[in-house]
Amino acid sequence: DAQLRQQDRTELVRIHEIYKPTMIYVTHDQVEAMTVADRIVVLKDGELQQIAAPDTIYRHPANTFVAGFIGAPSMNILKARFNRDCICIGKAVLPVPELWRQVIGQRRDLLLGIRPEHCRLSEDAAVQGSITYVENTGNQRTVELQLESGENISVTVSDRNADVQNSSGICFSWDDVSLFDVTSGRNIGYIEKGEVFTDAMGS
């Protein structure tokens, strides 16, 4: 069961810390990969998708496959269109910071990724939707919304006192955004400590 698996992961990490062996651990369980590994290799149909530390893979997935595979709920992926200094998600128009404009370059159509825990519910937000489902797991709630564009988005709310039923807008920080090429699904780059990086394959 889930508790036994957690105990096994803890014991495996403890043994590794004591004896320091080189270990290759193969798993389909993303939680095991994130909690046990120093570095993760993500494969799809036998092809390498990304190799990096768990935190890097979580924050800067190399492509939409990795973004969807790592994390539960998985990263929200929304269709977006860049126009001058703004990005459009459905009818919502959001200003794009200068460094992100450098990453985007001449691209127009993009996929914007944002993890559920990095979204905030706000009635006044530019991105609007309607709540379709609320899952309460005790320590947090996951709110599912359908945007005006017809796309679905998940928002994780840890504040037990938050009024999730009367907040249908979604806002987020550009610090938490991932942008992907609409054709290949590849991460086009990211911002880290004020610097622009154009390779999210691994580090």
Residue ranges and their predicted role:
Residues D1-F65:
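ABC ATPase nucleotide-binding domains
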Residues Q7, H60, G68-F69, S122, ...:
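Residues that scaffold the ATP/ADP-binding catalytic core of kinase and kinase-like folds
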Residues D38, Q49-Q50, K79, N152, ...:
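Secondary-structure boundary/capping motif
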Residues E47, G68-A72, N139:
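Gly/Ser/Thr-rich helix-start
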Residues A53, F65, K79-R81, Q128-T132:
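Residues located in well-ordered beta-strands
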Residues R59-N83, G113:
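C-terminal boundary and immediately downstream tail of ABC-type ATPase nucleotide-binding domains
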Residues P73-M75, R84-S203:
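Non-catalytic connector elements of ABC transporters
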